[in-house]
């Protein structure tokens, strides 16, 4: 190999090594998450009795929940906001991340052992059937009325959601919620 060819080869090799080193040095391995929010003194109250809802999902067959992503047993519930401040125009339930299955964003079955159903979680849904990931806010509803009657009835639901082939058993979970405003 001539000295000129060897020089070109060496320069190309060193250049590619420098480029790969530069590329490795620019890889991003850290970042930040910025949180913005707002607190308000303008609020609504949760109607007495709605602060601790119990939803009974129907007893259904595991055949209806045979594979991941299958849903069944949708059951509606409502939460009523009352006594809303005059400047509150929309209200919704924000469902906290309590009991969240990190794989699906749905609510884990808290039961364990032989009596617990397996490969099933409970999915929160808006009134149109669209899923609500735990840690998210459901659909906002318009606030209407005056005085203590100023409020909104918010309609949501829960349904079984298969994470795989389900097995027979009991399901129990819960979602904490907080009123959110627009």
Predicted regions and their residues:
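Mature extracellular/passenger domains of Gram-negative fimbrial/pilin and adhesin proteins
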Residues: 2-7, 20-182
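Bacterial N-terminal signal peptides
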Residues: 10-17
């Amino acid at each position: 190999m001539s000295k000129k060819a060897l020089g070109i080869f060496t320069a190309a090799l060193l250049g590619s090594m420098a480029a790969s080193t530069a590329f490795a040095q620019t890889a991003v391995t850290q970042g930040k998450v910025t949180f913005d929010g707002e607190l308000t003194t303008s609020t609504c109250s949760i109607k007495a009795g709605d602060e601790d809802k119990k939803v009974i999902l129907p007893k259904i067959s595991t055949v209806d929940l045979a594979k991941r992503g299958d849903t069944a047993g949708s059951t509606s519930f409502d939460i009523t906001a009352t006594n809303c401040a005059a400047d509150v125009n929309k209200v919704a339930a924000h469902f906290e991340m309590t009991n969240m299955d990190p794989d699906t964003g749905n609510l884990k079955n808290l039961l364990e052992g032989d009596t617990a159903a397996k490969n099933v979680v409970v999915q929160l849904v808006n009134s149109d059937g669209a899923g609500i990931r735990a840690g998210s806010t459901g659909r906002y509803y318009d606030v209407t009325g005056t005085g203590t009657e100023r409020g909104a009835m918010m309609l949501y639901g829960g349904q079984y959601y298969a994470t795989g082939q389900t097995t027979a058993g009991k399901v129990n979970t819960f979602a904490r919620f907080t009123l959110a405003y627009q």
